[in-house]
């Protein structure tokens, strides 16, 4: 038994020695690629490595010729990348990480060495600070489809020319790695170095005689859109020619400057590339078309397929991007084809891009009935073109009658103001800061104003007006709050457009409707935008028959401030059942009619008596209206005007107005026996001062009135108009001539004034609806007849303080 046990122990010892020897032989044999006889480079090095002491250790690392990324199954390195990786670069990084994960190796990544720890051994992927500061490799020299793989110290650098090539470069590195010891060792030769350059069709670029490599780029850092284009320019040149341009801090020599230029700076073209010595400018005045036109330039100049591009000093490339034409969108302009949709499409495009819109000179654009309007938000030029607005088929049931043909609109949507509690007349601030200047509409439904008297008597309208406020809610002194608002039923802010626009030229003929109704038609050009000018537009009317609906006004202004209608031709409409107008303003401020004329006679008595044409002008709820240098049939303010000026004009049918503030009439000729009428149906009121200077009344009869103001009494008091009425605070007449058909006309400054009044009527004792009289009337330099204050029998009127000077 003892012999058997001894024999077994001896056998176990022999087996143990044999296993130990076998293990030593396997370790000396090397890694995956080695084998007993060496094999390839990795196997040779493994096979040739020395054995460990006591036959139990592996070969020593060959750090002179290799970088060891993994030792003893643990990573000796970390990945270094930039912070915001392109998705393609991140995908390439993931490929590497998964490669090591499959070997059972956990790896780490730092997003740049300044935000993490620095290790002695790293794989640098792409552009990052460690790469820039420690690796003498210019990534841009290889082009967008090239790459560099090399070792620098104990770092492996992978530099793709662009994200598109990152995966290719990473796979190339992975194929060069040597994996040994069943994945416990991974190394890469220090001699690894591979550079692949992109082959380009465009091989050279010279600008003003200087190679592209000398140039850099500039775009204002604050202008994101322009800087994005400059970046796109850089990337395009890099991908097409391998030329990389850095950004400069400011414009200067050898700098290509991208700029949002003015139209003048682009020579009127809107887009201009210009080379002057060592400076290049690429500018566009239409920001929305910068990218599109820049692309056209690049395709024509740099991406045409040429092997070389040389742009000399003085070179320029331009495109007129400032305008587009109706014909570009299919408008025919033959006077027969309905061009409404094509014209609408042209303006829709321009409203997006900011371009001017042009009609083709000589074209006639026909526009029929459409329940829609053409929105205009950019300068528009109709010079030399004609339009036909055909209203003949539009009856009262056709909704097209409610639409303007052209609607000049704001760039900003109106905004409801909900946090104003109440307001008082004369209040200086509305208590709300809008952050921008605006025209503000106010309405209170709890009190009625302008309760009309007479043939068209009504129950009045809600208290309402417009005021101009600044960004802090301060009320502009020229548009004071006129009424008390115990409750604000509605308040709307119409932001004042910074950029003004102009509609220029063209002739429009309205073929009038024949509807036998009193419903008003629109069908014109309406301004709903502040800072707008309509100039040189001529409007005529044909096809007026025995019936027809009235028109609101071909030239309309609504909810706007600073609007001018200049050098336009207007036509009075035939009168049927209601007043009908060719120009109109409502709830607007600072509306000016300048050098406008009427196509018909404004002076013929027969013409006026036959009601061939109604007064051409009307307004409601407006402030600071003016008419200068015009020859028109009428200036008319229905529901109030605050401040009005008429100068250097001829007014045929009449000046009829109510309101307040300053009424200035200077160097104006009026035809008829009454120069100025304060409208009886709204209380013959002007709550302010009236100034008349150097004016003339033509074709007067035997009795002429400077001012006609009829305040109607009933049962000893006035009609309630929703407000107390005032003839005027003061009246000044300085220079007034009457040309009469009578040999000895009588001139009265005031008409009888109070209709139905007994001689004893005294406004001061009328405690219900008194008619406040002026505190002074001053007259000087009146010629053409015998002048007196009034022919009224009312003592209160006769006793108005009156001073006559010659």
Feature-to-residue mapping (PLM):
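Intrinsic disorder/low-complexity segments, especially N-terminal tails and targeting/processing regions
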Residues: 17, 27-30, 107
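Ser/Thr/Gly/Pro-rich low-complexity, disordered linker/stalk segments of secreted
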Residues: 25-62
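Extracellular/periplasmic carbohydrate-active domains that bind, remodel
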Residues: 112, 238, 242-249, 303-806
């Amino acid at each position: 038994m003892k012999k058997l046990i001894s024999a077994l122990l001896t056998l176990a010892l022999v087996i143990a020695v044999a296993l130990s020897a076998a293990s030593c032989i396997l370790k000396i044999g090397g890694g995956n690629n080695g084998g007993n006889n060496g094999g390839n480079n990795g196997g040779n090095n493994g096979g040739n490595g020395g054995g460990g002491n006591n036959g139990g250790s592996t070969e020593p690392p060959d750090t002179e010729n290799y970088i060891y990324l993994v030792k003893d199954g643990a990573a000796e390195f970390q990945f270094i990348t930039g912070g915001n990786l392109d998705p393609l670069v991140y995908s390439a990084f993931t490929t590497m990480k998964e490669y090591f994960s499959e070997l059972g190796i956990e790896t780490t990544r730092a997003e740049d060495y300044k935000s993490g720890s620095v290790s002695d051994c790293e794989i640098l992927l792409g552009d990052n600070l460690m790469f820039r500061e420690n690796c003498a490799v210019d990534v841009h020299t290889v082009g967008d489809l090239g790459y560099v793989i090399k070792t620098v110290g104990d770092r492996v650098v992978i530099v793709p020319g662009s994200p598109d090539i990152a995966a290719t470069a990473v796979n190339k590195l992975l194929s060069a790695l040597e994996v040994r010891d069943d994945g416990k060792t991974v190394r890469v030769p220090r001699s690894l170095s591979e550079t692949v350059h992109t082959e380009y069709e465009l091989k050279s670029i010279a600008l003003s005689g200087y190679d592209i490599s000398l140039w850099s780029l500039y775009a204002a850092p604050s202008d994101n859109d322009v800087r994005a284009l400059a970046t796109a320019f850089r990337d395009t040149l890099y991908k097409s020619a391998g030329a990389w341009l850095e950004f400069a801090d400011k414009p200067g020599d050898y700098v290509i400057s991208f700029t949002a230029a003015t139209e003048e700076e682009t020579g009127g073209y809107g887009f201009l590339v210009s080379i002057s010595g060592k400076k290049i400018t690429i500018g566009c005045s239409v920001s929305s078309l910068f990218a599109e036109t820049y692309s056209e330039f690049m395709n024509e100049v740099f991406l045409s397929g040429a092997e070389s591009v040389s742009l000399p000093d003085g070179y320029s490339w331009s495109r007129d991007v400032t305008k587009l034409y109706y014909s570009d969108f299919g408008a025919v302009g033959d006077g027969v084809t309905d061009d409404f949709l094509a014209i609408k499409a042209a303006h829709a495009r321009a409203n997006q891009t900011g371009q001017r819109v042009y009609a083709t000179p000589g074209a006639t654009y026909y526009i029929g009935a459409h329940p829609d309007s053409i929105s205009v938000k950019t300068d528009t030029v109709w010079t030399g073109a004609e339009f036909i607005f055909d209203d003949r088929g539009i009856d009262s049931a056709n909704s097209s009658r409610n639409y303007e043909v052209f609607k000049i609109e704001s760039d900003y949507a109106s905004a409801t103001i909900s946090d104003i509690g109440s307001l008082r007349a004369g209040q200086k601030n509305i208590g709300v800061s809008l952050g921008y200047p605006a025209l503000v509409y106010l309405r209170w439904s709890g009190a009625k104003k302008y309760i009309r008297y007479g043939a068209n008597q009504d129950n009045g309208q809600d208290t309402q007006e417009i005021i101009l406020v600044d960004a802090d809610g301060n009320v502009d002194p020229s548009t004071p709050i006129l009424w008390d608002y115990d409750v604000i039923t509605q308040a709307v802010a119409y932001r004042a457009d910074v950029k003004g626009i102009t509609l220029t030229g063209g002739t429009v003929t309205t073929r009038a409707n024949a509807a036998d109704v009193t419903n008003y038609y629109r069908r014109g050009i309406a301004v709903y935008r502040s800072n707008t000018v309509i100039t040189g537009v001529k409007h005529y009317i044909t096809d007026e028959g025995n019936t027809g609906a009235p028109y609101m006004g071909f030239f309309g202004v609504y909810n706007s401030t600073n609007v001018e209608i200049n050098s336009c031709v207007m036509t009075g409409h035939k009168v049927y059942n209601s007043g009908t107008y060719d120009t109109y303003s409502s709830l607007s401020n600072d509306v000016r009619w300048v050098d406008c004329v009427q196509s018909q006679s404004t002076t013929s008595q027969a013409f006026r008596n036959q009601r061939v044409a109604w007064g051409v002008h009307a307004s409601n709820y407006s402030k600071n209206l003016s008419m200068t240098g015009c020859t028109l049939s009428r200036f008319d303010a229905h529901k109030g005007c605050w401040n009005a000026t008429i100068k250097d004009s001829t007014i045929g049918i009449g000046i009829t107005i109510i309101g307040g503030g300053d009424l200035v009439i200077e160097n104006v000729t009026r035809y008829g026996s009454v120069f100025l009428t304060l409208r009886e149906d709204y209380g013959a009121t002007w709550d302010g001062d009236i100034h008349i200077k150097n004016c003339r009344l033509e074709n007067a009869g035997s009795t002429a009135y400077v001012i006609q103001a009829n305040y109607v009494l009933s049962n000893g008091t006035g009609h309630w108009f929703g407000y107390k009425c005032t003839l005027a605070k003061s009246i000044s007449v300085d220079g007034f001539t009457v040309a009469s058909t009578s040999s000895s006309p009588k001139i009265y400054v005031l008409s009888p004034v109070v209709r139905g009044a007994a001689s004893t009527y005294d406004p001061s004792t009328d405690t219900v609806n008194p008619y406040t009289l002026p505190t002074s009337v001053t007259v000087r330099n009146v010629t053409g007849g015998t002048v007196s204050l009034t022919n009224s029998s009312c003592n209160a009127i006769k006793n108005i303080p009156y001073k006559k000077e010659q």
